[in-house]
Amino acid sequence: MSDMNDKKTGADKNAPAMTGAKAAQENGSVSITLPSAAGAAPTQVSLAKALAAAQQHHAMREFDDAKLIYQLILDVAPDHADAIFYMGAALHQTGDTAQGVELMKRATQLNPRAVALNHNLGMVYEAIGDMPAAIACYRQVIANDRGGHWHCTLAKQLTDAGQLDDAIEFAREALTLLPPHARGIAHNQLANALTLKGELAEAIANFQIAISLDVENAMVNSNYVLTLNYQSQPNLAAIFQEHKKFGDKFESFVPRMYVNPLLAKARADANADPARRLRIGYVSPDFNDHAVGKFIEPVLAAHDTTKFEVFCYYNKNRVDDATKRMQAAAAHWRMTSDMFDGDLATTIQNDSIDILVDLSGHTGLNRLLVFARKPAPIQVTWIGYPNTTGLSTMDYRITDAFADPVGATENLHTEKLARMPECFSCFKPPSNAPEVKALPALARGHITFGSFNNFAKITPEVMRVWIAILARVPGSRLVLKNWCLDNDRMKTFMLQAFAQCGATPGQIELWNPNTSNFDHLNCYNSIDIGLDPFPYNGTTTTCDALWMGVPVITLAGVSHVGRVGVSQMSNLGLQELIAKDTNDYVDKAAALANVQRLATLRGGLRERVRTSPLMDAPRFTKNLEAAYHNMWNAYLSTQKS
């Protein structure tokens, strides 16, 4: 049974008891009599003051009191848009989202020019996953307020929805509307959309401008270093230095909790038993049906609870079936998205966490500034990001000898590399995945290659190599599919980009995204061979393809970001799918385009994956727990000296 953080979720038990209300008409204006504590004189106030009182209760999460006053206002002013809206918000916050959204929507219809109401409704739609409705609200906001900052909000939502060209247009418009000193966030939003579109040089330039305008914005700095990983010809030493700059900059801004040697010694002396039950804390916004969730969920379920007490610090309000499964597997569950970095760090320290594990790196909604404060004696980064965090306070990065060969990448990390004996992660396939069907080439008469990765990974060099493969395999096709292809503008852009790299009409097929994971996976039943991008490999996309019987050709890079495929194929015993350079990549893809060979490989691939280290959660978790014990023992030895 998971324990929940003790954040107040209902009316304060010590709030005054409600005794009654009435409406009065005074000098042509409506007033109401507010309920009061028992024995106290009732207070007659204007509707504006009543609304303010209700909102004060609302802000304190005293929802019952707030709703009572909202209703009193509506009893005498049934079309009071603010009271309707905030009554809906309170209903949403207390579990009645359907009714709450209806009320909030009605309020915006009554007052369509209310910027705050439309913006807040957009945020609610965003939280419940209705992105089209959220975007419609943000567009209405811009129709009423063209100050520029709302354009940035809309650009972000359009980017998240894959409407990249629209996002770019609104971000560029924001740059014309905002004063120069306030344009940092617009440059950041523009860069994010450009990154996902694959226009990396312009994206990096805009990130650099954004940082110059907003030096201490950690999110912008994280977005920048993340995007550096996508470059076609990366300078790994320079990329490491940019990550290290992040660490140096933001560690200098925050108080570090474990720099006090007396505190560290007291903690070690009190917990010096190397065999005791360790407290492990996982920090992530992805404890849900997200790519990272597919790798952490099997570990949470397999942890030895007699030796490890697991805390999950969840940095998002979204709750789905995967969230519920992970929450059930954890001993303690903390909802942290509303917590400031310092408050979360204090919570973690008060929980006496021994080993704190970051599952985000520099990806969205990370809490690296919590790790910069060093709230736990041992801090580790794992699975969410294929590079160093740049933090000196991050002690270890979990990897394996395939993704980070011994001696090859230590100089590119601020962390010590903790290598798993087999693979660095363990994947949980969806329980409702479709069955693997017969090789599509048997019915179609031609080979279909495919990649379902995001376009930031598909650089012009990748396009040229993939087109060379199509030239080697007569009649073959290449299918691209991802969440940004739900609009004709993006399809036209990608077809033109491939044409500029030598593709001929009909060679490239662009498929729309699917609304269900089952339908998404079923698309692999139309793919014969998967192609892994480089130098930034796929991870979840490769696991999905393999689970659906689709072998994936990968190119061995120099560092982790380009060697994930090496780890995956090596752990499957499919080293013949690992290319040493681009020419070898083309050769291996062409050689694999043999119908008989493919049909045989496809027929046994799911079982091969199922029985491999990639999906053996108990085996992987045992290795991970051994690594945690090694880290703890090493820490204890340093405290004794």
List where the protein language model places each region.
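A conserved nucleotide-sugar
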Residues: K307-E309, I467-Q496, Q500
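Thr-Gly-centered strand-to-loop micro-motif
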Residues: D82, D358, F452, K481, ...
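Short alpha-helix at the nucleotide-sugar/activated-sugar donor binding site of glycosyltransferases
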Residues: L546-W547, S570
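Short acidic/histidine- and often glycine-rich active-site loop of Leloir-type glycosyltransferases
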Residues: G562-G573
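Alpha-helical solenoid repeat scaffolds of the TPR/TPR-like class and their adjacent stem/linker regions
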Residues: M1-H446, R464, T492, Q496-P505, ...
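Nucleotide-sugar-dependent
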Residues: T363, D532-T541, L555-R563
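Short hydrophobic "strand-cap" motifs at the C-terminus of beta-strands
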Residues: V283, F452-N453, K481, W511
